[in-house]
Amino acid sequence: YLYGTLAIPRFLDITGSRYQMSLFITRQLIVIADDSDFSIRLLQNIRMRKVHQGVNKGRFLFNFVTEFLERDYEILDSMEHTLMSMEEEASQRETENYQEKLMPLRRELLTLRSYYNEMVDFAKNLEENENGYFRKKQISYFDTIEDRADRLMNKTAQLLEYAEQVKDA
């Protein structure tokens, strides 16, 4: 069997507690165990929104992972706008409290970068298909997940660089 654990940040408290989830994958099935109703909510969303909910294990995992990565670009865009506002404040010498706002944002970005790195590794492990649980066609789903997580990680790294520039402003 394949086994993996995921620790997914909660977007209302990125540096706080995470949704903890374990996945057990065998040739026949996928078992998901978590410490909350998070996976149940994901599955309900998939049932409501996806036409191809899980015709095979690869497609199911793709839908499942992309469901919890769904809003990440939105969150990163929001963080970027916050940084742009801070930069504007700094350029107008309204620096009161902006350093206090910047540090938690940088911590959140560092947390997200680490999380996206873990997601890239998770997708690569599935892509390797060591046990032969997935057909060749299904492996492309994991490549897509890896690409998405990699883009999110790169966007996060860019925002960290931007935060550093704002800090120095």
Feature annotation, model-predicted:
Residues R27-I32, E70-R71, E108-N117:
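Alpha-helical transmembrane segments of integral membrane proteins, especially early/N-terminal helices
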Residues Y1-V51:
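Divalent-cation
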Residues V55-L83, L102:
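Well-ordered alpha/beta subsegment
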Residues F38-R59, M84, E89-R93:
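A short, charged helix-loop
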Residues E87, E94-A169:
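Membrane-associated alpha-helical segments
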Residues V51, E74-L76, R113:
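A short, ordered amphipathic alpha-helix with a cationic face
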Residues Y1-I14, E74, I139, E164-A169:
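Short intrinsically disordered, low-complexity coil segments enriched in acidic
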